[in-house]
């Protein structure tokens, strides 16, 4: 057996590592959690010991279906410390309550340490409530008129300023599918259009554009290592190794 992931080298040069697990069978999901735990620890140590505190290449972890990989130990502390080492984690959840179910009281700490949050849509009550409160209120002008008729008719108008939720829970639940709400640290939340992936310069390289671009995992795993003239190898005689 040998290590072919080389997790500690991800911050040395531009590298893409894909961790793919079944979305219907959770038997081995704990492996993903273990990989992330080891990845964060190795990269933080290397950033401190080799590069003076920061990796030369930023490492971005896009953790889709974060709730399905199990608990990453001490994640609430890691998300607060990895940023200074040029490491970031993007947690993708269906609903915010998934995070609470796994990390309990530490869920709020994890969310609080995120520099940006994006809401793509949903109808889960807790998520909508938290988002509506985060957006705050706006000031609206309210006019009330009264008209009394009879022997002594009267007419009156009152004007007042009132606070109103910027977006209520029912408005968030029916948010346009092409819109999203983004909050960046130090900036008021704002409504934005979702990015059109078909406009990305590399879209033509995806399988959505052309099925010929689909990556065949089985074919890749079954590939044979090609040996070229001049390649050097270390030969170890197992019989000469000292016994344990």
Q: Which sequence ranges carry the predicted segments?
A:
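P-loop NTPase motor domains
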Residues: 1-87, 102, 170-191, 200, ...
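Short, surface-exposed polybasic-aromatic patches that bind anionic ligands, especially phosphate groups
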Residues: 196
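Conserved ATP-driven motor cores of ASCE-family P-loop NTPases powering translocation/secretion/packaging/pilus
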Residues: 79-181
